Regions:
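A nucleotide- and high-energy phosphate-metabolite-utilizing enzyme signature
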Residues: 1-308
Length: 308
């Protein structure tokens, strides 16, 4: 389908939502939302380039953060990086990018964009560490692929090596600060399934720690069992988060008492399909949350040992 209007985009979103409510897996749901966004970005860039009679030379559009991981929840922001070869390319394509962003907003996408030149990408902004963490999950979407290749092959390998220790320290600080905000416990009566201890952020923080430390592909012995448990937990909590977005009609990740009851009645995420009361269903949630939080605590401990 050529997604060339807000009406068509809304119809596609509704189709994806209905499929989720009818039992389509959360993985397939998030992939469908992601693919829809990618297609619209690519088509919109082509259309805006034609409208201004300019080729997007010197510009690469990258997906970062969750979108970079090929995960897009129903009401999440669309995190993109506009990467320019230099300042001249940025100035030349200013009108093209303004129209690209406007078109995406018109089609119902909540665009969260950042702009950098290749030279600017050589530095890590100390006051904006979260952006650089989101850059770990990056991939090319549209535009000039040679610019992206320069980033991957020439710029970031050196930058990540130079700033590895700093990113280690800042990621640890950010993680501990977030956990402290929620009392360092998974047991909240109405947990935030994204940011609370045991939420999806724990899983991503753990992955970032391994990546920063150069251990992204390490899987040994008991790690295989832990990985499988963590993936099951991510699947369950992702399903809960997707459910919350559709129930609330916005990017609200709080699992309220009312929604706990509805989730339990629907046997959300419970593979046996048995009906449970809210308290019984929440025990399943806490079991999965404990798995993700344990994995994060283990990553924090390993990082502490490495730093000594």
């Amino acid at each position: 389908m050529r997604a060339n209007s807000r009406t068509e985009c809304e119809a596609e979103r509704h189709k994806i939502q209905q499929a989720f409510l009818d039992g389509t897996s959360v993985h397939a749901t998030l992939q469908a939302l992601c693919e829809m966004a990618e297609r619209n970005i690519q088509e919109s860039l082509q259309a805006s380039s034609r409208a201004h009679n300019l080729e997007p030379e010197g510009l690469a559009v990258l997906a970062i953060g969750g979108f970079g991981r090929r995960i897009l929840f129903p009401y999440s922001d669309l995190d993109i990086l506009l990467l320019f070869e230099n300042g001249r390319a940025e100035q030349k394509l200013e009108a093209v990018l303004a129209e690209l962003t406007r078109t995406l907003w018109d089609r119902g996408f909540r665009v969260s964009s950042a702009a950098r030149t290749l030279d600017e990408s050589k530095q890590v902004e100390r006051e904006n560490v979260e952006f650089h963490l989101s850059m770990m999950d990056r991939r090319f979407l549209a535009g000039d692929q040679t610019v992206y290749q320069k980033l991957e092959q020439k710029v970031l390998p050196r930058t990540e090596k130079v700033y590895r220790s700093f990113l280690h320290e800042e990621l640890t600080k950010l993680t501990k600060r977030r956990l402290a905000k929620y009392g360092n416990t998974i047991f909240h009566l109405e947990p935030n399934v994204k940011d609370s201890p045991g939420g999806l952020r724990d899983f991503h923080a753990s992955a970032w720690m391994r990546q920063v430390a150069g251990r992204a592909s390490e899987i040994r012995g008991a790690d295989i069992v832990e990985r499988d448990l963590a993936l099951n937990a991510v699947d369950f909590i992702s399903q809960v988060r997707c459910f919350l977005h559709y129930q609330n009609g916005r990017n609200d990740n709080t699992l309220t008492y009312e929604l706990q009851t509805i989730a339990a009645e629907e046997s959300l995420g419970a593979k046996d399909g048995l009906k449970r009361n809210a308290a019984e269903w929440m025990r399943i949630y806490y079991r999965h949350a404990r798995t993700l939080h344990h994995q994060l605590q283990r990553s924090l401990s390993l990082q502490s040992i490495t730093a000594q």
